[in-house]
Design a protein with these regions (language model features):
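Secreted/periplasmic carbohydrate-active enzymes, especially glycoside hydrolases
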Residues: 1-170, 174-178, 245-246, 265-268
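Substrate-binding/catalytic cleft of secreted carbohydrate-active enzymes
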Residues: 145, 155-348
Length: 348
């Protein structure tokens, strides 16, 4: 709960315009009033403060001289202070650009700041041993992100979960790219179709349609509307975080429906990021990425106009004594008993 003036700032939207060395600021006041004046101050340790003025209902453009990029190697952030009447907010932004372009050989690649950038990431389901989905403290979130970076990863795919915004802040300042999943929802799906048959078909390149809603657990129109609403809310909530570079709409057919329509809706909300429309199995040919999940078969890739990404693989497990909550049960797509063999397989 926060005490605010009668007329106060409701929403702040910040969009970096990388190729223009500028940032666009859009401010919304709680009463929906247009043409209300506000002041903007942009600061950074490498420059003198930049001051300008804007009005609600109109984009406010701020040019950034001697612009410094944001990347995992150099996660540079600019601070911004905005004052409207008796209300003020502080935030930050970064100058970075994510897109798909062809490289010099005509192969579609993900570009970060106008250069091809290989993303090597982990799937993070956000579980904690004591709080389940609730992190115990700020330091625990920092530790996870920093440890992944120390191990050589530059991306985390946040899987079927929205974290507290503090987590995304740490990704912003530490320098960790984020692929953000939408929370799936829907009713219970048919495992024989969504899991077993889909896995068997993955290597055939036969495109299964997303119209069998009763098999995917998404036959309820109310649930479809709820998903659309929550997808929009997720994008709006996380829009200002520079670390977030990809929206993942559906995962492995769980509650999947109207994939092309949902992709168009997500693009209307945010055209500055990439979209992985269907991560694994039920690809509908839309979005920026052909997203492959391959746990069991030799990798078989066909040329695509989109980026081809191996977005799930591995799942190897080696139980370490006294480091498991359940000593008897262990999950993995391949279970190892000896550390040496496991290390060799991971290397290869």
């Amino acid at each position: 709960m926060e005490k605010v003036p009668e007329y106060h700032i409701k929403n702040l939207k910040i969009t970096p315009l990388y190729d223009q060395s500028s940032v666009m600021i859009q401010l919304e006041d709680a009463a929906g009033r247009k043409d209300i004046d506000y002041d903007v101050t942009v600061t950074a340790r490498t420059m003198w403060p930049l001051k300008t003025a804007g009005r609600t209902g109109r984009p406010c453009m701020v040019r950034i001289p001697h612009m410094r990029n944001w990347s995992p190697e150099d996660p540079f952030l600019y601070d911004v202070h905005i004052k409207m009447g008796n209300d003020s907010v502080e935030s930050y932004f970064a100058m970075r650009k994510i897109e798909v372009k062809n490289d010099k050989n005509g192969i579609p690649r993900i570009f970060l700041n106008n250069k091809p950038y290989f993303q090597k990431g982990v799937l993070d389901q956000g579980y904690w041993p004591d709080g389940l989905y609730t992190p115990p403290c700020d330091e625990a979130m920092i530790y996870d992100i920093q440890k992944m970076k120390d191990l050589g990863f530059n991306m985390i795919r946040k899987h079927i979960k929205i974290e507290p915004q503090r987590w995304y802040y740490h990704c912003d300042r530490i320098g960790m790219l984020v692929w953000q999943d939408m929370v799936n929802g829907g009713r219970e799906y048919k495992s024989w179709y969504v899991t077993w048959l889909a896995t068997a078909m993955e290597g055939t390149h036969i495109r299964a349609k997303d119209t069998r809603l009763h098999l995917m657990g998404r036959q309820d129109p109310t649930g479809q509307k709820q998903f659309e609403s929550e997808m929009k809310e997720t994008i709006r909530r996380l829009y200002n975080h520079p670390s977030v570079v990809t929206w993942v709409i559906f995962n492995e057919g769980w509650g999947q429906f109207k994939t092309r329509k949902m992709t168009d809706i997500a693009l209307a909300e945010d055209h500055t990021r990439l979209i992985d429309s269907a991560s694994g199995w039920f690809d509908q040919g839309c979005g920026d990425i052909k997203s492959i999940h391959d746990y069991f078969f030799p990798l078989n890739i066909t040329p695509e106009k989109r980026v081809t990404a191996l977005t799930e693989f591995g799942g190897y497990s080696l139980q370490i004594p006294k480091h498991s909550m359940y000593e008897k049960d262990i999950y993995g797509y391949k279970i190892f008993k000896r550390k040496k063999i496991s290390a060799e397989r991971m290397k290869n």
